[in-house]
Amino acid sequence: MHYSITIRGRGGHGSRPDRAHNPIDCFAAVFSKFQSLNCHITRVDGGTAANVIPGELIFCVESGDGEQELVRCLTPICKLYHCSFEIECP
């Protein structure tokens, strides 16, 4: 099954990372976790400028484990990074 997942954080200027919640950092942890699952990340889109922390990152994943397993994995990681997520099944 194909899913599109949006991770939302708090964007900001790269010189003030203390004021942001970087969804790219969160995604790095998600990516690491997904390596142990039946998931294959097929697309990543996040950030538009070198000196800006983005407010969101969108990635696509093929998963045979289903949406509930994705939610189970994403919830604690996103909470740790002060981010939220939304899963779409286009």
Feature-to-residue mapping (PLM):
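Midchain, well-structured core segments that form catalytic/ion-binding scaffolds
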Residues: 1-90
